[in-house]
Each structure stands twice: as C-alpha cells, then as structure tokens.
Amino acid sequence: MITSAAGIISLLDEEEPQLKEFALHKLNAVVNDFWAEISESVDKIEVLYEDEGFRSRQFAALVASKVFYHLGAFEESLNYALGAGDLFNVNDNSEYVETIIAKCIDHYTKQCVENADLPEGEKKPIDQRLEGIVNKMFQRCLDDHKYKQAIGIALETRRLDVFEKTILESNDVPGMLAYSLKLCMSLMQNKQFRNKVLRVLVKIYMNLEKPDFINVCQCLIFLDDTQAVSDILEKLVKEDNLLMAYQICFDLYESASQQFLSSVIQNLRTVGTPIASVPGSTNTGTVPGPEKDSDSMETEEKTAGAVAGKTPDASPEPKDQTLKMIKILSGEMAIELHLQFLIRNNNTDLMILKNTKDAVRNSVCHTATVIANSFMHCGTTSDQFLRDNLEWLARATNWAKFTATASLGVIHKGHEKEALQLMATYLPKDTSPGSAYQEGGGLYALGLIHANHGGDIIDYLLNQLKNASNDIVRHGGSLGLGLAAMGTARQDVYDLLKTNLYQDDAVTGEAAGLALGLVMLGSKNTQAIEDMVGYAQETQHEKILRGLAVGIALVMYGRMEEADALIESLCRDKDPILRRSGMYTVAMAYCGSGNNKAIRRLLHVAVSDVNDDVRRAAVESLGFILFRTPEQCPSVVSLLSESYNPHVRYGAAMALGVCCAGTGNKEAINLLEPMTNDPVNYVRQGALIASALIMIQQTEITCPKVNQFRQLYSKVINDKHDDVMAKFGAILAQGILDAGGHNVTISLQSRTGHTHMPSVVGVLVFTQFWFWFPLSHFLSLAYTPTCIIGLNKDLKMPKVQYKSNCKPSTFAYPAPLEVPKEKEKEKVSTAVLSITAKAKKKEKEKEKKEEEKMEVDEAEKKEEKEKKKEPEPNFQLLDNPARVMPAQLKVLSMTETCRYQPFKPLSIGGIIILKDTSEDIEELVEPVAAHGPKIEEEEQEPEPPEPFEYIDD
C-alpha cells in the first residue's frame, strides 16, 4: 500500500519521456488520495501539458484538471479538462466528471446567452472543445433516453437544433411537446428566445401525422399571432372540421387577451363574406387548403342546412358558422354555459349564513355578511337569502347600502341578457332622484355582471357617468365602467374617466383612478402613465392617490422588463403611496413569471422601507409573481411570517393565500395556522382570509384541516368578545370557502397554463379591501367554475355521463349544517326524601342486571347492521354539465358505452366539444331558468268550455 506519492512525483524530473508518461499514469491512479501532495508539484505537470512535443500532454492535462478540482479551482480544472480531449470521459459517473460537466454547461450557457443578445457581427467565438463536451453530453442523454434532461440543457444553452432533434427522436413525441410547451409558459423569462422556441413547437405540431391545431393555437396566443390563428380557423371550416374550429375558439376565449380575441374576430369578419359567397374559395391567408375543399364545403352546407331547418340551396351556412365562432370568441357562449352550470348545481348551505347573521352585532360585520352571501351565491343568480331577510338587509345605510346593492352584481355575474331589467329598481332614473348610495351600487353591480365582457353596456354606463351629478353615483359609475371596459383601451371611456379624476373630488377620484387602470389594462400607454403619475404627484387627496396607485400598476400588467423604468421612478418617490404603487407595478408586470430580479426587489423593500403599507404591499406582491410554482412560496415567506412587524406578517399571509389559491397546500396552511392566533387582530384577519383562499373547494380527504378551519371561522364569529377585524376576516373566509354554491375555485392561471388576466386583476383589487370594503367584490373576477361541459355539433349540451374513477366522498360537497333541535324547557328539580332515593337506587341495580343479559343479543344485531351497510363504490357517474374539481380531472373518463368522443383530453376540463358517433336522435339537457325578479306576465284567461247541450230533467 502506497503511503506517499513523492517517489512517483520525482519521476517527473527524469529526462526520459517514457518515465514521465509512466509517472503521469501512476499519478492519475492515486490523485484522489494524494492530491494535496501532488498539488505542490502541479506546475511540473502544467509544463508537460504546455510542451507540444510531449506525446502524453493530454494525460498531463487530465491529471492537472483533477488536482485543481480537488483544490476547488473549478475554472482551471475545466480548462485542463478541455485540454484532455477524449481522455475526459463524459460517461464516467464519478463526482469529478459530474462537477466538471456541470461547470462546462454553465460556462457554455453563459457564453451562448451573451452571444444571443449581441448583434451578428459582434458575437464572440465559442471554444470548440467546450461545445464538443456539451454535444457529447447531449448524445449521452439521448442514448440513456433522458429526453427531458436534454430538452432542459438545450433550452438553457439556446441550442434550438438539439431541442428539435430531441423531441423528434424521443419515444413519446406528444409528451415531449407538452413538456416543452409547459417549460415555455412557466420558466422562460426572455421573450425573444421564448418566441423562437414557440415557432419551433408550432412547426413540429403542424408536421405531425395528424396536426395538433389545439396546441398550435396555444403557442400562437403566446406569439400574439392573430393572423395565423384566423387562418387555421378558416382552414378547419373549409376542410369540414367545424367541431375542431369550435373547440379552438373556446380554448382561445379562455386563454387569450381581449385585444387578441377582438383581432381574430375582426379577421373572421373580413373573410366571412368571401367564404359564404364562393363555397370552396381558396382565400385562406397563409395556411394552404387541400384540393377537395369544394366537396367538403358542400357536405358542411348540407348538414348545417338540416340543422337550421333550411333547404341546402340557400347556402348561407358558412357565414352562419363564422357567426357561431364569433359568438364563442366573444365569450357570450362560455358565459351562458357557466351560468347554466352554476344555477343547476348550486349547493349553498344557507344555514351557515343564517348562523352568521344571527351572531353579528355591528355594521362592519353586517357588511361582511352581505359580501360573504354574494361570494357564496356568485353566478348562481339566487338571492334567496336577501329576500328572506329584507328587514335585516334594510339596516344597511350609506356606504353599506352601496356595498349591499353592488353585491347583486356578484350574485348575477354573467347574467347579462336581463341585467338592466334585474337592476332596474337600483339604477338612476330621469323621473325622481333615488338614494345615491343605491344608484352608485347599482352601476357598480352592472360592471360586475359584465366584467371583462362589456359590449353594449359600456355605452349605457358611459352615459350614466356623464349625467351623474352626485360623487357617490360617479364612484359606482366609474368602477362599473372600468370593469365593463376592462382592457379595451377605449379613448372615449379613458377621456371621461380622466375628466372625473381631474375634478379633484376624493370619492369620485378614487374610483376614477382605479378605473383608468382597468380600461388601459396591460396597454403600457405612455400618455396614460404620464397623466396618472403626474396627477398623483399633484393631488392632496389620499383617496385619489390610493386609486391611482393600483391603476398605474394595472396599465403595466404583463409587461415584464418594459415596466422597469417606471418601477424605478416609483420606488424612489418620497410619497409612500407611490412607492406602494411601485410594489403593485412589480406584481402586475412580472405576474406569474417567477422572475428572480423582481423577487429580490420585493424582498429588499419588505425589510427596508420605512412605511408599513409599502412593506405590506411588497410581501403581498410576492404571491402574484410565484403563483405558477405555489410550492415555492411557503419557503420564500416563512421567515417573513415570523417578522416582528405585524404588517409584514399580514402581507406574508396574503401572499400565501394569493399564490397557493385553490391548491390546499399543506405547508402554506401550516404557516397560517399559528397566525390565526396572532396577538394583532388584522394579522388574524389576513390569516383567516388566506386560509379560505387556499382551501376553497377542498374536502376533508384532499385537505384534512378544512373542517378544523370551518369550526375556527364559526368560533371567531360567535365569540362576543372577539375583535371586529378578526370577525370580518372570518365572515369573508366563510363566503370564499363556499363560493359559487361550492362550484367555483380561484386560480390565477387558465386551464391551459396562461395567466388568467381577470383573476389577477380581481385578486389585486380585492386586497385593497384593507382601505375600502366595497372593493371586496372584485374577488368575483377570480372565481372559475370547476366544471366540464360537453357540447354537440349544434353547441347544445347532450345528455352524457362522465366516469370519475375514485370514491364519491373524495370530491363530494361538504355535508350541510344540521338545523339545531329546540331544547325542552328544564323542569325545576323537586325535593327527594332519603327513603325514596334508596328505593330508586335498588330499582336501578335491578335494571342494570337485566341489561347485561340483553347485551349479547344487541351486539349481534349491531354486527348485522354493519354488514348490511354497503361499501362505498370506487367510481361515480357524473351528468353533463358536471362539477369536476381540478384534482379530479386526472381520474375522469368517458363511460365505455358512450356514443360521444371528446375533441381534447377530459383531463384539461372546461368546455369540450363532443363528436357524436351514433346516428340516433340525441337527448339534450334542458336549460334552467335564472332566478331573480321577473316581470309579471298577465295571467291568461281560462278558455271557454266546450259546447254542450243542457237537458232539463
């Protein structure tokens, strides 16, 4: 056994090259044990490597590389490893090889990324030896079938050639494509490179044996290529693949922005007429159509004509198909279907609300109960609780009346066709002036009903705001108009809101400032930013500043690094409200990106700013940036949740609620649990609301602590000595937990992984309830129905069943509260003589002996009963439209005997077009009527009796 390498090292001083080679081979064998000793003579080994006449100079490089590796000098080690050429074996599994390969990839990645940002002429040459090792690494991944690893390295090193090759060579091309698309959506922060990757994905998807148009359109949404989407839709219509076109339209509505959809609709309108007038026209933009277009068009016309009950000769069907697609893209269809689902499946437990109503004793809790009721009935159109408690509701005065009236907008969310009729009694009238609070609330409610889908109601709200003379009505009108015209960037709407802002009225200005942001959402409009920031720096009203703080952030929604200059200037402002606006701007610009720079900035402000509101906003904003990876959030905010500053603790609670909304994340709940007993009441409020956001729609099986928290909410509400702030949080939490009749969840991203703009906006404005309770209603924008709705070729709901392959109790509705039984009046105890007591004692002993004899029989009977109790089945059949929770989608399938085939996997959920494989007549689901006030129809007179002959006896 060798105890020293001194003898081998001495051979390096010999003249004979063969002795030196022998020494290097021996040193290579013992370098891991004697590297410290060899390091003293490493210069001799370096000299051998530099001697170009030395035959084994590559071996010298390998030994030197290993010595430097042990010394921790990884850069030198990498340089010598590159010099070792093929002697550096990338397939070796030693720690040395793994480390050097990692360093090699890091170094190569850094050079590739730097080159990507430089113009073509200024790019630095990359060491061919470095590229050689990386290429060997790629080959090793492919040989070992580690395709995901290869894709990851290819994307990091910007090697699109390897990226494409890896996907095509993998044994699961659709799986690799889905994985790559997911990476693009969630992890890529460089927009330019992401677009290049998406173009490659589009090419691969289109070149598949059966092109995957659904995923192509998902890529095109990211690329903001509306023309290509329009071309695909036209191509599908012409190829008689109308059902696929409908499915893509539904997916587009769910994932794309309003501007994108408007552009696609515009493109369809411009090509609609030529398609209709010339069947089989090849005018399809950039997507070439097959030769048999005219035949396919004819068959489509015949089938469509039969559906509409018209003769095929008339042939206006293609235009009719385009109109249907436009109806889907505009959102009209999805909103109607979701409304039907929520009305049909409403499962609200009114007992919870009744108990809360009976327990509340002040106006703040009264308002909270009204808000909770609207959350519980969001989109169900059921105002049963309010109708049953009109006298109690009438206690709401002033701004509480405004909030209560606006809550009807949440209850009737999406009930657009009859919105004006429903709200008629609360809206401003020409004849007699009503309550300003009621009228303002009514206009706000109209905005909530039409949120992000304004249409004709925008002009109505515009006129009402123009004619409003009262600041309260203007407040409600501004909020309503902002919601209805969200993201439209309409100049006339912007100008009117700006006029209202410049009146320098605190109440009007607060709503107008926020509404400006809603209208210009994500537009990055320079003029809007200048107007808003300029006015914010001038005004003396804190309320106006608060509205503008959020409004400014909304203008920069999704703009990422384009918002950096504005963020810098806001963060340096001496006004704490504008610094807070800077935090919200970071949250909106980088929402869902997981951007490290943004996270670092927020964490820095969270511990360094002198203003509590700014620190709280900074921590809250972390939730918006991390929501794509909710499992990361608890570790990021865990220390902040134990901060000495209660505002930071509150912010940490809300960040967890926002980031982990609807996930039932156990780590997040474990962090929130101690915060529900915090000595500061508003921290408890935040923890209670955040816990409900996380546990919305969770059952005891999916999240064991849900019932424990339900009891906690009830305990806080019923405790007379508890603080109003905590009670407000508990009441709101009850409403959130059971939202939409137990049929909605909260998610900041769409089912396909795109950031869901209305949800992000809704949650951000909801967090402003800290300053202004009526803004709580904005949370309704984030409620997403957890449904699967199957549609046939006529876009009607057929009667069909889905099979959920798990026990019904796993995702069941929570059991309703039991109605408490009336207690019998206690009888006054009478005096008992000692003799009577002794006699009774003897009787009891006799009875006890008899009972013991009976026990055996009773035990046998109990066992029989237990045997009779049937075990729970392992599956459940759900009727269309079905309530299916996100976790349940994985175990969902069509029944074996089903006549329908879905156009995309059921595991995605949402609205799915079904292909009918049978010729039989379809059974359709009957639509249900919405609740709410109706115009009384005149009763029809009874028909006169049939003629008869009267015979006198």
From Swiss-Prot:
SUPFAM superfamilies per record: ARM repeat (SSF48371)
Subunit composition and interactions: Component of the 19S proteasome regulatory particle complex. The 26S proteasome consists of a 20S core particle (CP) and two 19S regulatory subunits (RP). The regulatory particle is made of a lid composed of 9 subunits, a base containing 6 ATPases and few additional components including PSMD1. Interacts with ADRM1. Interacts with ZFAND1.
Residues where N6-acetyllysine is found: 310, 720
Transmembrane portions of the chain: none
Protein's UniProt name: 26S proteasome non-ATPase regulatory subunit 1
Residues modified as Phosphothreonine: 273, 311, 830
GO (cellular component) term, any one: proteasome regulatory particle, base subcomplex
Region described as Disordered: 277-319, 839-881, 930-953
Gene name for this UniProt entry: Psmd1
Any one of the GO BP annotations: proteasome-mediated ubiquitin-dependent protein catabolic process
Organism, scientific name: Rattus norvegicus (Rat)
